[in-house]
From Swiss-Prot:
Keywords annotated in UniProt: Calcium, Calcium transport, Endoplasmic reticulum, Ion transport, Membrane, Signal, Transmembrane, Transmembrane helix, Transport
Subunit and interaction comment: Interacts with STIM1; the interaction is inhibited by the interaction of STIM1 with EFHB.
Source organism of the structure: Bos taurus (Bovine)
Keyword Signal: yes
Membrane topology: Single-pass type I membrane protein
Protein name (Swiss-Prot/TrEMBL): Store-operated calcium entry-associated regulatory factor
Free-text note regarding domains: The cytoplasmic C-terminal region mediates interaction with STIM1, while the N-terminal lumenal region mediates regulation of SOCE activity.
Domain of life: Eukaryota
Signal peptide limits: 1-30
Cell compartments where the protein resides: Endoplasmic reticulum membrane
């Protein structure tokens, strides 16, 4: 009996161990299967700009990723996008993705990217591994406002030139050149208009001291305006600014630049400073001082492709909605 009972007990123990092993393996497999999902069974995805996907074979990726478009990725960043399964084409799921976008923007190309469970060809994907890659384009309204604000045409070339001029590589050289040019212009203005240097006396001549040759240096000439050279004034009683210095014979050969040279230089200087003030995009004078025909604040600098952020929106008229629900359509890519 003891001999017979020994093998029977051992067999029962081995069977119990095998059943326990199968139970543990089956439980572990069922637990692991929870993260293995058939792609076509996914009905909807809710994705956030500040979260990452799960991963098993590859590195995690952002749930929302902008990959370009006419508006660029820095102009606007949606906080959350929801994508819904709109059908199966026999290989991939087709998606419709929606979110609230500024009226100036719309979705371009969109694609949902999911990590295949075993490989990139696996019909099963890892749960939580799906993310959205999208492009952001301008709407017709956005392009219209962009043209009205002057950023699509001449401003782009000016801003590109300005950025290159004041880039870190050329900022030092550009600053030195600018200072030198401004100092040269200031010296020219001072030399032409404001300097009253001591001129050498005229050479000895038998002409009377009050002859017409030196009439503009006679005591009868009126005093020059404050800060101006004496040769820019005429004799006593002459019209201000146009004396015999311009109609008569010059006192001597080294009297300095003429009136028209100084006038031309002053005109060029005024034009340069005036156009610089009118064209610099970093001052309020770049935008028109009169109210635009379209009552809005699109012309303000708050509307800039470089001033975006999570859920940011550009300023619009109070009579128009600032955002609306935008949709993008695309397929699936397994990685």
């Amino acid at each position: 009996m003891a001999a017979a009972g020994g093998p029977a007990a051992a067999g029962r123990c081995a069977l119990s161990s095998l059943l326990l092993l199968l139970l543990v393996v089956g439980t572990a497999q069922c637990w692991d299967e929870r993260d293995r999902i058939l792609l076509r069974d996914i009905k909807a995805l809710t994705l956030y700009y500040d979260r990452y996907t799960t991963s098993r074979r590859l590195e995690p990726i952002p749930q929302l990723k902008c990959v370009g478009g006419t508006a660029g990725c820095d102009s606007y960043t949606p906080k959350v996008i929801q994508c819904q399964n709109r059908g199966w084409d026999g290989y991939d799921v087709q998606w419709e993705c929606k979110t609230d976008l500024d009226v100036a923007y719309k979705f371009g190309k969109t694609v949902v990217s999911c990590e295949g469970y075993e490989s990139s060809e696996d019909q099963y994907v890892l749960r939580g591994s799906c993310g959205l890659e999208y492009q952001l384009d301008y709407t017709e309204l956005g392009l219209k406002k962009l043209r009205e604000s002057g950023k699509e045409h001449g401003f782009n070339s000016f801003s590109n030139y300005y950025s290159k001029l004041y880039s870190p590589e050329s900022s030092s050289l550009g600053g030195v050149v600018t200072i030198v040019v401004l100092l040269a212009i200031a010296f020219g203005v001072y030399k032409f208009f404001l300097s009253d240097g001591h001129e050498s006396p005229p050479p000895y001549s038998e002409d009377p001291p009050y002859s017409h040759r030196y009439q503009r240096f006679s005591s009868s000439a009126g005093p020059p305006p404050a800060g101006f050279k004496s040769e820019f004034t005429g004799p006593h009683g002459a019209t201000a600014g146009f004396g015999s210095a311009f109609t008569g014979q010059q006192g001597h050969e080294h009297s300095g630049p003429g009136f028209w040279t100084g006038l031309g230089t002053g005109g060029i200087l005024g034009y340069l400073f005036g156009s610089n003030r009118a064209a610099t995009p970093f001052s309020d004078s770049w935008y028109p001082s009169y109210p635009p025909s379209y009552t809005s604040t699109w012309n303000s600098r708050a509307y800039s492709p470089l001033r975006g952020g999570p859920g940011s929106s550009s300023a619009c008229s109070g009579s128009e909605p600032r955002t609306r629900t935008a949709s993008g359509y695309g397929g699936t890519r397994r990685r």
